[in-house]
């Protein structure tokens, strides 16, 4: 086997392993917010994804209503947590796992998580509470994905 072939084979295997690990971490961590929404929000996660200017990936402009404002606050919360509690992590805070559970209708963040995990859980808990408090303002026409 030529050294060149061996080198490119190692690079290919390493690249595939890195991508697989990144996808696993992202799937696991984004699952927290997905399942929290699925479990505790009045609407499905799909009804919020792509809603207004801030719900989903990215965000800019003026929120279209109180639901979209919840997403803007959530984006800002993640930004603040990324700079403060999670500042020691190299990767994006959206990829960090945390534990939570339900007690009745209340979301409870695991106090055993580190400061970063607890803060991220609180960001996600707060947006679910905000969604539920403002559910009357939900307008399907603002959902770019399903509306």
Swiss-Prot record:
InterPro entries recorded for this chain? Answer: PLipase_A2, PLipase_A2_Asp_AS, PLipase_A2_dom, PLipase_A2_dom_sf, PLipase_A2_His_AS
Residues the record lists as binding Ca(2+): 56, 58, 75
Name of the protein described by the UniProt record: Phospholipase A2 SSD1043
Q: In which tissues is it expressed?
A: Expressed by the venom gland.
Keywords from the UniProt entry: Calcium, Disulfide bond, Hydrolase, Lipid degradation, Lipid metabolism, Metal-binding, Secreted, Signal
Q: Which cofactor does it need?
A: Ca(2+)
According to UniProt, the reaction catalysed is: a 1,2-diacyl-sn-glycero-3-phosphocholine + H2O = a 1-acyl-sn-glycero-3-phosphocholine + a fatty acid + H(+)
Q: Where does it localize?
A: Secreted
Q: Which residues form the propeptide?
A: 23-28
């Amino acid at each position: 086997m030529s050294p060149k072939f061996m080198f490119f084979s190692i690079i290919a295997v390493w690249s595939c392993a890195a991508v697989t690990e990144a996808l696993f971490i992202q799937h696991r961590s984004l699952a927290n917010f997905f399942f929290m929404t699925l479990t505790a929000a009045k609407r499905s996660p799909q009804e919020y994804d792509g809603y207004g200017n801030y719900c989903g990936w990215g965000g800019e402009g003026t929120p279209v209503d109180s639901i979209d404002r919840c997403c803007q606050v959530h984006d800002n919360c993640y930004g603040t947590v990324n700079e403060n509690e999670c500042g020691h992590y190299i990767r994006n805070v959206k990829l960090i796992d945390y534990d939570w559970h339900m007690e009745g209708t209340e979301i409870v963040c695991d106090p055993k998580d580190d400061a970063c995990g607890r803060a991220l859980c609180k960001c996600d808990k707060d947006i679910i509470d905000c969604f539920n408090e403002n559910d009357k303002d939900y307008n399907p026409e603002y959902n770019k994905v399903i509306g």
